Amino acid sequence: INEEDSKELFASECISRAQRAWCHRLEAAILSNPKPKTMSERFLVMALEDSAERELTTCFRLLEGLEQTKVVRSVENVLRFAHARIRSDALEVLSNLGVREATALLVHLLEEGDLVERAQALTGKVPPPREQETLVDELDASEDRWLVLAARRARQEPGREEISSEE
């Protein structure tokens, strides 16, 4: 595989992973409002959030294959740990890295504000959120074992074990 082909592969995979991170984070946000009432709902939300975070991390590793590692890691660290003003500068740098389509998705995902509102600006660029039943069916076929476990758990009797208000 030559350098041009590997860059194309990295770019394509980065877009795909960014879209998946968006889907999982958005679906977790939607399922979290109102607060999950059962352990299986809570586990599903946690599995989606975890998957989104892993996809996001993978996007940054893929960007390192397209850009200077030091720059990408610096942007990633600022986005994870800095306050709003510095984060906005890092988002600006991120928007100019790698594949514009992928980094635009990442910038929108990492910006401050309501995730559902931000998703509306990306209509057509990321798949719309799935209904819970469809989501569970599709996650059951996932290669991610945590998503599969969460999907199988979500199929069990809903409301069977309500979370106590003390938690």
Question: Whereabouts are the PLM-identified features?
Answer:
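Long, helix-rich interaction regions
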Residues: 1-167
